[in-house]
Amino acid sequence: MGDWSFLGEFLEEVHKHSTVIGKVWLTVLFIFRMLVLGTAAESSWGDEQADFRCDTIQPGCQNVCYDQAFPISHIRYWVLQIIFVSTPSLVYMGHAMHTVRMQEKQKLREAEKAKEAGGTGTYEYLAEKAELSCWKEVNGKIVLQGTLLNTYVCTILIRTAMEVAFMVGQYLLYGIFLDTLHVCRRSPCPHPVNCYVSRPTEKNVFIVFMMAVAGLSLFLSLAELYHLGWKKIRQRLAKSRQGDKHQLLGPSTSLVQGLTPPPDFNQCLKNSPDEKFFSDFSNNMGSRKNPDPLATEEVPNQEQIPEEGFIHTQYGQKPEQPSGASAGHRFPQGYHSDKRRLSKASSKARSDDLSV
């Protein structure tokens, strides 16, 4: 087996900028696949061709039978599976780093323009803001957003398809378990030849283990798709429903809010001597009508009218109530509450006065 350090360093960077389920998936990939494959599984398949025996001395027959039994070695097949499954994550990491660098350059250009205009800024602050625009961490959880979220979802879809393809391919090539006896009927073997696999039980244990880990990785990928995709769809549907409710309630609310009284309407009612007829405009807006809108403005102005030598017609004079009028129909208290004496007529004789 080769050195896994190069691939491990890249996957560590992916681990830093993944969701919680993505971190679990990477942990499974590191421990249960790469570590087990590099230590235990490789030693079990190290002698498979040397210990593969057939009941024949025909030259080339044993090699042909081994090629028929193992089109590709299990260990090499799993290495290819790990590489193909990990490649989308590496592409995502490359796109994330490229996005961060581009945003850092953009922020730096904006800072230089602001500095020329009289502002200040630092590169470290801009780099931090650029990173937060791609992803943000809330309570220890990574929340992806923007184009980086779309790339991450595509990465999960590709690796899910790879997992399914390799699991189906392994089942079609080998099945689930290895047989101890393999019967070979290929040329140049003169007749059916019995061949024997080395340590089949130990190899079957690793085959089942690797299949189970692949199934676990597939389940985690589907769970992460649900976490990122389905919840986002539900949130958008909820927002659209709330927007429809606001649109339905919006016109009626604005109509009610648009019907407002004059600024001094309630104050005029409160300043009246008798507050029997006072009520807030907002409570019963259309219950009563003001018979004369100018009356509330003219009564306070009577204090400013100077007493001159002619008779004034005042709104505060109590009118005569007809005998047929009902007691329930009363004028507002402010209408005849002014008890000041009427302005007296001049003592000088006028031509139109009646002689007694």
Swiss-Prot record:
**Keyword terms of this UniProt record:** Cell junction, Cell membrane, Gap junction, Membrane, Phosphoprotein, Transmembrane, Transmembrane helix
Q: Which residue intervals are topologically Cytoplasmic?
A: 1-19, 98-163, 226-356
An example GO BP is:
ventricular cardiac muscle cell action potential
User: What GO molecular function annotation could you give as one example from this UniProt entry?
Assistant: gap junction channel activity involved in AV node cell-bundle of His cell electrical coupling
Transmembrane domains' residue ranges: 20-40, 77-97, 164-184, 205-225
* Post-translational modification Phosphoserine, affected residues: 351, 355
Tissue-level expression reads: Highly expressed in lung.
Where is this chain primarily localised?
A: membrane
- The UniProt annotation puts the region (Disordered) at 241-266, 279-356
How does this protein lie in the membrane?
A: Multi-pass membrane protein
One cellular-component annotation, GO: plasma membrane
Q: Where in the cell is it found?
A: Cell membrane; Cell junction, Gap junction
Which ranges make up the Extracellular topological domains here? 41-76, 185-204
What assembly does the database describe for this protein?
Answer: A connexon is composed of a hexamer of connexins.
What does the sequence similarity comment in the record state about its family?
A: Belongs to the connexin family. Alpha-type (group II) subfamily.
What the protein does? One gap junction consists of a cluster of closely packed pairs of transmembrane channels, the connexons, through which materials of low MW diffuse from one cell to a neighboring cell.
The entry's protein name is Gap junction alpha-5 protein
Q: Which organism is it from?
A: Rattus norvegicus (Rat)
- The encoding gene is Gja5
